[in-house]
Amino acid sequence: MTEPITIGVDHGYAAMKTAHCSFPSGLAEYEHEPYTQKNVLCYDGKYYVVGSGRQPLQKDKTADENYYLLTLAAIAKEIAYRNAPTTTPVILAAGLPLTSFGREKKAFRAYLLREGKPVSFSYEGISYETSVQDVKLFPQGYAAILQHSDLLNEPSVILADIGGWTVDIMRLDNRIPYAASCRSLELGMIRCLDEIAEQVRRSLNLSLT
């Protein structure tokens, strides 16, 4: 039996990221097979071009199948990068916003786990028969600072995780997160770029694309 591999996936509003790949969080559905296999996911008889455009903002990522489909693409990319068998089972590691971690944890875990049942799909013409055996969830940003022992020795540290849609802020006192200081602000890069484009349009009557 093939041993499972652990794959970390960042389900961003702007991009999906793993240790070895990154692609826009866009998804375009096609009724028939597209003319190319590049970035094409086939699941449940439907075709999707992964990384096409940008997802409309949805605060609840479990509201539809889009982020699950993007996760399948991320799994395929990681399995291919590691030259692992296409039947390799997977343990997923993912993050959730600091302020909604407890509230969203159960639903997001079930959304990704799918009861650990086998899942069949193809990506870029290669067939995969895998399963998600476990899902481990962590507060966004916190894992990153644990790699910097010099910062952890500070009596107080402010962590700012700047993402596509949100900026997550956490204070650590003597290595321990101070829960009351956690904030998730809708001031990420998407909002920033949209605001810049709007100001340029108003001031210069130019459109940034």
Name what the model sees in each region:
Residues I162-D168:
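Ser/Thr-glycine-rich phosphate-binding loops at phosphate-binding pockets of nucleotides
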Residues V200-T209:
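A mobile "lid/hinge" subdomain adjacent to the ATP/sugar-phosphate binding pocket shared
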Residues R171:
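A short helix-loop
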Residues I196:
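P-loop NTP-binding/switch modules centered on Walker-like glycine-rich loops
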Residues M1-L159, N174-R191, S203:
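Nucleotide/phosphate-binding catalytic cleft detector across ATP-hydrolyzing
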